[in-house]
């Protein structure tokens, strides 16, 4: 399967908003978020991905079809060094999971953006924990550190590539 990343332009903003709703629907099982009175979860930082330096919104395609998205952000939960990056959000649609698409996509992301990385996920999201551990172990050849947030809600990994 051909996996490609496409940097989203501002013209893709409404596509990202729609995909973010799918993501937030699934994520609500962990965050316990509710929809608003208009039937949306919303996402406070959508516009920031086109207005703030260091943010990169990527569309993930599998054989040309939309399969998900990845948002790179400079505001890490744990890592505070200048130039550090984190995966702000990462989503692969259900029909594309467990096929190696997420691993291929995130490997491309790491290769495009060299430097200091932080990957955090909610502790109660066990499938995310399994995915990110596998990705980070494979990508770094087991050269990573573990991290966590002060509120003990998130855990994750840091590394440099």
Predicted regions and their residues:
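Conserved beta-strand-loop-alpha-helix junction that forms the acyl-donor binding cleft
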Residues: 119-133, 137, 147-151
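Conserved acetyl-CoA-binding loop-helix of GNAT-fold acetyltransferases
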Residues: 92, 98-111
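A short beta-loop-alpha structural element at the N-terminal edge
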Residues: 3-19
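Conserved acetyl-CoA binding element of GNAT-fold acetyltransferases
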Residues: 81-94, 120
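A short helix-loop-beta-strand connector motif used in the catalytic cores of GNAT acetyltransferases and
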Residues: 45-59
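Conserved GNAT-fold acetyl-CoA-binding loop/helix
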Residues: 24-47
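Short secondary-structure junctions
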Residues: 5, 139-148
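Conserved beta-strand in the GNAT
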Residues: 59, 65-74, 86, 91
